[in-house]
Amino acid sequence: MLQVHRTGLGRLGVSLSKGLHHKAVLAVRREDVNAWERRAPLAPKHIKGITNLGYKVLIQPSNRRAIHDKDYVKAGGILQEDISEACLILGVKRPPEEKLMSRKTYAFFSHTIKAQEANMGLLDEILKQEIRLIDYEKMVDHRGVRVVAFGQWAGVAGMINILHGMGLRLLALGHHTPFMHIGMAHNYRNSSQAVQAVRDAGYEISLGLMPKSIGPLTFVFTGTGNVSKGAQAIFNELPCEYVEPHELKEVSQTGDLRKVYGTVLSRHHHLVRKTDAVYDPAEYDKHPERYISRFNTDIAPYTTCLINGIYWEQNTPRLLTRQDAQSLLAPGKFSPAGVEGCPALPHKLVAICDISADTGGSIEFMTECTTIEHPFCMYDADQHIIHDSVEGSGILMCSIDNLPAQLPIEATECFGDMLYPYVEEMILSDATQPLESQNFSPVVRDAVITSNGTLPDKYKYIQTLRESRERAQSLSMGTRRKVLVLGSGYISEPVLEYLSRDGNIEITVGSDMKNQIEQLGKKYNINPVSMDICKQEEKLGFLVAKQDLVISLLPYVLHPLVAKACITNKVNMVTASYITPALKELEKSVEDAGITIIGELGLDPGLDHMLAMETIDKAKEVGATIESYISYCGGLPAPEHSNNPLRYKFSWSPVGVLMNVMQSATYLLDGKVVNVAGGISFLDAVTSMDFFPGLNLEGYPNRDSTKYAEIYGISSAHTLLRGTLRYKGYMKALNGFVKLGLINREALPAFRPEANPLTWKQLLCDLVGISPSSEHDVLKEAVLKKLGGDNTQLEAAEWLGLLGDEQVPQAESILDALSKHLVMKLSYGPEEKDMIVMRDSFGIRHPSGHLEHKTIDLVAYGDINGFSAMAKTVGLPTAMAAKMLLDGEIGAKGLMGPFSKEIYGPILERIKAEGIIYTTQSTIKP
């Protein structure tokens, strides 16, 4: 049975002359800050005791208060709005600053004793109005133990809530349990009703009705105070057995499913000195920084539900960090085997009830309290995000900071029992007189936080703490993190926009395009620096040395130059481009410098890697193997803007795009290596795409796909292909350019600066071997012959003006000239937008023998007069990785791509908030 400590009502502790009674007035103010705050500091029985002694008690009316106003009136209280007559005003939580009355004595939980920033405005107002504040939290006995607290009821309500939450979470994981019939604490009229629901659930557990595949449930209680005792009082109503922490591992694996197991954790169970793994309580109290917690390795892996009731102080070890959570969410080594319909738990740790509600405290990743309205959230350690659901990956979290308000009547009565013996001396407080003149007991006197417009000596440390924090914040703002962005092309804008959201990041943009950086400087708060890194390596090194991070958005051939500067100055770096062999050669130097360089963070390469690795890692977690992987990606004009012979438009230099058709490609198909030569024969490798039929797509293989068997860790795959998507007709048009000799990077005499200007007609005449003075029809016939009689390719050349008298742009080669020409002809207009299409296909063989065909589709559109789809999908993931490095979310060192969960997990989640959405679909065949 739930046992709650109560103090009997006796005569108040201070004897007064009756002549003073009429002057001393007590008021109980209504709670008006939180909608769920239905408690009061005193119950009617306490009011009756006070009024019987001749004191006047005012009760501010409140329909929200759980105990009815009429019960207070019946006990002798006077119901009225105006409480200005009172010399002592009691509440539970803080009043609004505008409702404070000067030179009164107030008693409530102020939450100011740690110089909490959120309540410093309240403290200032209290000091200004010369209010005497008695803080319940500091009412302690000679041992330092609190004599007035709601702690036990926080434990009771918190335990009821987390049992309810576990019922919901386990159901989301595929398991009906007896916990489903336990409601939230506030759904019960009193704790006795809640206890009966817990007992009913316990009876079903004792009958063996818990799912076998989830294994024995273990509950760990931290601390031995009132909070822990209250939680244990509810837990004890289940068929439970308490074990020592060192026994937890065994019972979590082989325990009896007809009971649940509990462990009460004290400091000596998990704290050890860093040097010799010994715990010395006296030393720990003085030097907690010398100790570490082994909770993450010795206790947490065998814990189903953690009930945390301890607060965290600076320099003390945390129970769990973000990194701990990531390892704990890995599939359990000792989980019972599951089958379809009766799955095993994805990991042992299912839920945490952080009754301390200490954000960023002993549970580092509990960064935000939940509420009674929204009591649960899920912490996904892989993604390092919190989402409001009981579904998906992660740990169920409950961290309500006003739990006793869920059982307001009993909490009020119990709290009032503890406060009652001190009320009379508090009523006698005269806030207009010096504190030293008051006849207070040590319990009350030492709880006075403010008096006569000052902080008593005991609490002057609050101002010191406050000033220290403000100095730290000022220093933090003064030491802004510095980022150098190299390159000012269209990809740079989403990067700058994303990083600029953090006002503590100082951004420098280096580029040889002076006009571009000037335009960027008008839109974003940046430091523009005009420079050509190829010619100003010394300036590059000087700039890099002053940064915390470098983002290179330059052509890939320049990345090694930037990387060398980063290595020399030990500065981290990210880039969206491929990790080239030249960059790979610097791998050892990167490791020796102890820095992080992450490449391939854009779209392709980038998001394609991340989506692939997420699927592959999840498959491996369940023991499945990848049999096939095919990925196609393309940047295209939106369909309505594709009306040209190439069905394509350019947002940057076409050189790379045009050269792709001249590059060979290698891929694996059904266990056989297929080699595709570049040039004219490349057209034979083009395949019609049957997904998204409305887009009329074609695809062709890209570079060497076979190397990804090792990179992705999928040597089991018999098919590996990465390719490029275009609208149908694109490759045929480019094939015509190849036939005509336009995809040629060789320098020609006719392109020298001293040569006479050349028209496209003259150039084509030369390429097809006829006189430059030939008539148009003669040229047309010769070109058609060169194209093998393909009229479609001829029409494309004519549409682009390649048979006309337009002057060829000055360039080093025909390819460079063609690129400049295509930019003029096929650039995006101001009202035109692009799109990104990506399709990943996987063949996944499960341990059961079933073959899963899984597809991932990512389609994104550019914004008219905004960022293009290409800029967003390349720039944002790059910026996110940069921010993660700055924030310490990525701990790995060396040269790497986004192949680890530490990198791809958060990025894949965060791109959704930016409107980059991907969808998945699976079909399973026997």
Swiss-Prot record:
It catalyses: L-saccharopine + NADP(+) + H2O = L-lysine + 2-oxoglutarate + NADPH + H(+); L-saccharopine + NAD(+) + H2O = (S)-2-amino-6-oxohexanoate + L-glutamate + NADH + H(+). Expressed in all 16 tissues examined with highest expression in the liver. The keyword Repressor does not apply. NAD(+) binds at residues 488, 512, 516, 533, 554, 576-577, 603-605. Bifunctional enzyme that catalyzes the first two steps in lysine degradation. This is Alpha-aminoadipic semialdehyde synthase, mitochondrial. It comes from the Eukaryota. Its EC number is 1.5.1.8, 1.5.1.9. It is found in: Mitochondrion. It is linked to Hyperlysinemia, 1: An autosomal recessive metabolic condition with variable clinical features. Some patients present with non-specific seizures, hypotonia, or mildly delayed psychomotor development, and increased serum lysine and pipecolic acid on laboratory analysis. However, about half of the probands are reported to be asymptomatic, and hyperlysinemia is generally considered to be a benign metabolic variant. 2,4-dienoyl-CoA reductase deficiency: A rare, autosomal recessive, inborn error of polyunsaturated fatty acids and lysine metabolism, resulting in mitochondrial dysfunction. Affected individuals have a severe encephalopathy with neurologic and metabolic abnormalities beginning in early infancy. Laboratory studies show increased C10:2 carnitine levels and hyperlysinemia. GO terms for biological process: L-lysine catabolic process to acetyl-CoA via saccharopine; lysine biosynthetic process via aminoadipic acid; lysine catabolic process; negative regulation of transcription by RNA polymerase II. Residues 28-476 are annotated as: Lysine-ketoglutarate reductase. The modification N6-acetyllysine is found at residues 48, 56, 93, 128, 138, 286, 458, 523, 535, 584, 707, 739, 761, 780. SMART domains: AlaDh_PNT_C, AlaDh_PNT_N. Residues 1-27 form a transit peptide. The modification N6-succinyllysine is found at residues 93, 138, 274, 286, 333, 458, 523, 535, 584, 732, 761. It is an enzyme of class 1 (oxidoreductase). Induction: Induced by starvation. Keywords: Acetylation, Mitochondrion, Multifunctional enzyme, NAD, NADP, Oxidoreductase, Transit peptide. The N-terminal and the C-terminal domains contain respectively the lysine ketoglutarate reductase and saccharopine dehydrogenase activity. The keyword NAD applies. Residues 477-926 are annotated as: Saccharopine dehydrogenase. InterPro entries: AASS (IPR051168), AlaDH/PNT_N (IPR007886), AlaDH/PNT_NAD(H)-bd (IPR007698), NAD(P)-bd_dom_sf (IPR036291), Sacchrp_dh-like_C (IPR032095), Sacchrp_dh_NADP-bd (IPR005097). It comes from Homo sapiens. In the N-terminal section; belongs to the AlaDH/PNT family. GO terms for cellular component: cytoplasm; cytosol; intracellular membrane-bounded organelle; mitochondrial matrix; mitochondrion; nucleus.
